[in-house]
Design a protein with these regions (language model features):
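Solvent-exposed, low-complexity, repeat-rich "mucin-like" stalks and linkers
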Residues: 4-38
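Short, solvent-exposed loop/turn segments at the edges of extracellular beta-sandwich modules
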Residues: 65-69, 157-164
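Predominantly extracellular/luminal cell-surface or secreted proteins
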Residues: 34, 113-117, 154-156
Length: 177
């Protein structure tokens, strides 16, 4: 048995939300289906969600029913990593600071920013990417003694060379020894 479906420009799908923050639960945005300018009742189509629990891109498949049975549409939405909450910044050795965090199993890498400017602008701002999600700490050297540094971190999920970012953690201030 072989079915042929038209992916028709007149058959459009709009999602109520384009992006969710990972929370460990299945995500199902509300779907609105239109044919031309007419909004269809849900009795004229079925919705199937795929990969809609973990971080990454989820797929939404809409299949018409009844007189719309030959029509189908596909769209997607993102599930981004949650904000990093348990971070620690310490300076116990001169001109060094260590940033540590709780590993996010949904992430593939981390980005750390540190700066002498609390707005993370200017020449003292540095951005470092940690490419392995198994790493849980990083020590930075060559810093200026007796200066305050501001640090924030976020997790990243890489899917098909596209990056999904969590929001930045709360900024932590540390005085470097």
């Amino acid at each position: 048995v072989r079915a042929t479906y038209k992916i028709n420009k007149k058959f459009s799908v709009k999602l109520s939300v384009a992006q969710f923050v990972y929370n460990g639960k299945v995500q199902k945005p509300k779907v609105t289906v239109k044919v031309g300018s007419k909004t269809l009742s849900s009795r004229y189509y079925t919705v199937t969600y795929r990969n809609n629990k973990n971080t990454g891109y989820a797929t939404v498949l809409v299949q018409g029913k009844g007189s719309y049975a030959k029509y189908a549409a596909k769209t997607s939405f993102a599930i981004v990593p949650k904000q990093m909450k348990k971070t620690s910044v310490k300076s116990t050795v001169k001109k060094k600071m260590t940033v540590s965090w709780v590993r996010d199993p949904q992430a593939t890498q981390y980005i750390i920013q540190y700066s002498q400017n609390k707005n993370f602008t200017g020449k003292t701002t540095k951005t470092v990417t940690i490419s392995k999600n198994t790493i849980k700490a990083r020590t930075f050297t060559g810093l200026t003694s007796n200066k305050n540094y501001y640090v924030r971190i976020r997790s990243v999920k890489v899917v098909n060379d596209k990056k999904l970012y969590s929001s930045w953690s709360k900024t932590t201030r540390v005085k470097v020894k």
